């Protein structure tokens, strides 16, 4: 019987009697081992602190001498928290009695989780005011920030906890401190919408600083649609005329897209135009018309604005144009709302407009953002899902009488080119990063390493360079970004390959598809479990959009196309599996094994578990599916004989054959 599960479950479920009975008559060594053992990443003490079981915690600390600083993994609001100390768990969950007990037992009030979150920050997050006061009184440092540079004051402001913010400010918490990405408590407050806390911060000397995205708190409030905060901030003497105008224009765009309040948007834009017309007039910066926006130009007069009232679609395009002018093409919200509008078009059955807008956003992302940006990855995944839907649902009647149109192969090919390009960019970027890690350059000057928090009236002048820095910080810490991008590219390639043997592709387009697959295959990028594109094509769990049958793996057409452009049928993954192994580890798809074998796959290759194609087929006899003699070479027979009889071959055969022999 494994007692650690009994002990853990008793602690988790507040079953003190069970816990005592299980540990009764156990030696101190056994008790120590059981109460420090982890189940699902957590110890009995950690889970009992998380769940608020006072008596269990007291028993573990006093009778069992549990280490008050042991850490574990717990979940809050569905998010896993790694390396959380007991005090952090109790503070986050709001269990004041347990917090006091732990502190009395010597718990470090400034202990941190893996992300450098302190118990005090955890209490600030969910508004546990009494715990905040208790921890500060016992030495908790309210200026310790998490790994993102986010302080206790910032999170209290973001979550709208007025009393905690007021208390921290009374202790002289740094009101203008910046996070890693340059935002301050005033930014967090503007984004969350608490006017009361905003006024409190301003009273304590908060300034209108600019973050790494080029955003002031005023623009942050406009983007999130908090009109009371915008109205308050534009009355401040430190806010320039241009900043007031930009805030009203951007807030109007938010009311169009986020709140769907056209009347309020028109009123805000009218106020902005009237402000521009005041002497001396402040004209808008002329923007080149964008085809994806249907060549819409920004209105420059109240008369033009009134004419737009009867055309909601033009108002929606106007919102996109305004947002791109003010925030710049690099801001996440610029791309987000382009894609948001495209999704609405798709819901209305206007798939051509959706593809046009999404393509524009993707082009913009690849032109400006760093390779493997999360936004670019998201765009590619969205295209894969959209194309899957359109291929499967073509001809289906939608609401409002529209029909899902057949997909245009050239649209899909254009996006596939962009996906392959992103993998190429990502691979070059990853290799460059690896080189930099091996040969680190000299440190950047301090001014380049930390955000500059200086007051500014507008985001437009600095947004491009600062946002690129922010995205570099994001991508540098995501080792799986290249793999995810490759998977999206494989998925779109799979959709295209399903059209290769149909009349949907002209000979020239087929040549282009195969050329793009060749470019993708020659990169030799590996995905999860060190698998190639061909591995992925042969394995059921590769499916991204499982709702649509044409997108499901294994894909015979994709495997065939990849073999045609030179994919290695004998490449092995981290478990020694070839594509042929994976093709057999599922409900068997007979044509796939024939295609792989015809493409040069070795019939008798063993994976690291000693499994072959034949053993994985069992109990089905192999000869009922294929002709083994047809796919067994003399070289394979020789290699198998060498391995079977454990014949020493080093120095006897060429070194180039060693790997081949070991595969058998």
UniProtKB/Swiss-Prot annotation:
Protein name according to UniProt: Protein fem-1 homolog CG6966
Quaternary data: Component of a CRL2 E3 ubiquitin-protein ligase complex, also named ECS (Elongin BC-CUL2/5-SOCS-box protein) complex.
ANK repeats: 40-70, 82-111, 115-144, 148-177, 181-210, 213-242, 529-571, 575-605
Positions with biased composition (Low complexity): 450-460
TPR repeats (start-end): 245-279, 335-368
Region Disordered, annotated ranges: 433-460
Listed InterPro entries: Ankyrin_rpt, Ankyrin_rpt-contain_sf, TPR-like_helical_dom_sf
Record SMART domains: ANK
Physiological role: Substrate-recognition component of a Cul2-RING (CRL2) E3 ubiquitin-protein ligase complex of the DesCEND (destruction via C-end degrons) pathway, which recognizes a C-degron located at the extreme C terminus of target proteins, leading to their ubiquitination and degradation. The C-degron recognized by the DesCEND pathway is usually a motif of less than ten residues and can be present in full-length proteins, truncated proteins or proteolytically cleaved forms.
Organism encoding this protein: Drosophila melanogaster
PANTHER family in alphabetical order: ANKYRIN REPEAT CONTAINING (PTHR24173), SOCS BOX DOMAIN-CONTAINING PROTEIN (PTHR24173:SF83)
UniProt keyword list: ANK repeat, Repeat, TPR repeat, Ubl conjugation pathway
GO molecular function: ubiquitin-like ligase-substrate adaptor activity
GO biological process, one term: protein ubiquitination
Pathway field: Protein modification; protein ubiquitination
GO CC terms, sorted: ubiquitin ligase complex
Lineage, top ranks: Eukaryota, Metazoa, Ecdysozoa, Arthropoda, Hexapoda
SUPFAM superfamilies documented for this protein: Ankyrin repeat
């Amino acid at each position: 019987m494994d007692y650690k599960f009994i002990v853990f479950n008793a602690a988790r479920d507040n079953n003190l009697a069970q816990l005592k009975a299980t540990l009764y008559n156990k030696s101190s060594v056994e008790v120590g081992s059981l109460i420090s053992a982890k189940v699902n990443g957590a110890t009995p003490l950690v889970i009992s602190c998380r769940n608020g079981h006072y008596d269990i915690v007291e028993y573990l600390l006093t009778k069992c001498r549990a280490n008050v600083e042991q850490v574990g993994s717990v979940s809050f609001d569905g998010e896993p928290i790694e390396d959380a100390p007991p005090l952090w768990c109790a503070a986050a969950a709001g269990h004041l009695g347990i917090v006091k007990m732990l502190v009395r037992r010597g718990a470090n009030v400034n202990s941190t989780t893996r992300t450098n979150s302190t118990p005090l920050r955890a209490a600030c997050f969910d508004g546990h005011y009494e715990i905040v006061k208790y921890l500060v009184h016992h030495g908790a440092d309210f200026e310790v920030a998490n790994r993102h540079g986010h302080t206790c004051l910032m999170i209290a402001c973001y979550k709208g906890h007025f009393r905690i913010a007021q208390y921290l400010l009374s202790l002289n918490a740094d009101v203008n401190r910046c996070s890693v990405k340059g935002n301050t408590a005033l930014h967090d407050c503007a984004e969350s919408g608490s006017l009361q806390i905003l006024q409190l911060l301003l009273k304590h000397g908060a300034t209108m600083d600019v973050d790494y995205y080029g955003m002031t708190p005023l623009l942050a409030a406009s983007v999130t649609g908090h009109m009371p905060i915008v109205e308050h901030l534009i009355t401040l003497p430190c806010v320039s005329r241009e900043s007031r105008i930009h805030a009203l224009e951007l807030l109007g765009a938010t009311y169009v897209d986020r709140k769907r309040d056209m009347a309020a948007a028109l009123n805000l834009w009218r106020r902005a135009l009237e402000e521009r017309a005041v002497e001396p007039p402040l004209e808008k910066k002329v923007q080149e018309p964008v085809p994806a926006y249907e060549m819409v130009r920004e209105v420059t007069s109240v008369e033009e604005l009134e004419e737009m009232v009867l055309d909601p679609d033009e108002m929606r395009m106007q919102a996109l144009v305004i947002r791109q002018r003010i925030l710049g093409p690099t801001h996440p919200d610029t791309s987000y709302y382009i894609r948001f509008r495209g999704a609405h078009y798709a819901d209305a059955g206007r798939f051509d407009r959706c593809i046009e807008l999404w393509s524009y956003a993707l082009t913009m992302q690849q032109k400006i953002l760093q390779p493997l940006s999360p936004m670019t990855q998201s765009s590619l995944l969205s295209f894969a899902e959209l194309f899957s839907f359109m291929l499967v649902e073509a001809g289906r009647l939608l609401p409002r009488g529209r029909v899902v149109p057949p997909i245009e192969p050239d649209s899909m090919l254009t996006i596939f080119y962009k996906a392959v390009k992103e993998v190429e960019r990502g691979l070059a970027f990853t290799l460059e990063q690896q080189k930099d890690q091996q040969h680190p350059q000299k440190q950047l000057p301090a001014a380049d390493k930390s955000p500059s928090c200086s007051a500014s009236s507008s985001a437009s002048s600095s947004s491009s360079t600062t946002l690129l820095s922010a995205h570099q910080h994001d991508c540098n810490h995501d080792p799986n970004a290249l793999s995810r991008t490759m998977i999206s590219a494989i998925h779109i390639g799979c959709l295209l390959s399903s059209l290769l043997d149909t009349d949907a592709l002209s000979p020239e387009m087929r040549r282009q598809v195969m050329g793009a697959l060749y470019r993708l295959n020659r990169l030799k990028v590996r995905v999860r479990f060190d698998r190639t594109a061909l591995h992925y094509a042969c394995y059921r769990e590769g499916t991204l959009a499982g709702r649509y049958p044409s997108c499901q793996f294994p894909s015979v057409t994709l495997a065939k196309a990849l073999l045609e452009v030179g994919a290695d049928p004998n490449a092995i993954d981290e478990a020694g599996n070839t594509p042929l192994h994976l093709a057999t580890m599922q409900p068997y798809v007979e044509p796939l094994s024939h295609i792989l074998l015809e493409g040069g796959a070795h019939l008798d290759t063993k994976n690291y578990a000693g499994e072959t194609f034949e053993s994985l087929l069992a109990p089905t006899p192999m000869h009922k599916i294929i002709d083994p003699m047809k796919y067994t070479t003399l070289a394979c027979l020789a290699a198998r004989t060498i391995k079977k009889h454990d014949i020493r071959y080093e120095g006897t055969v060429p070194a180039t054959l060693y790997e081949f022999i070991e595969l058998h």
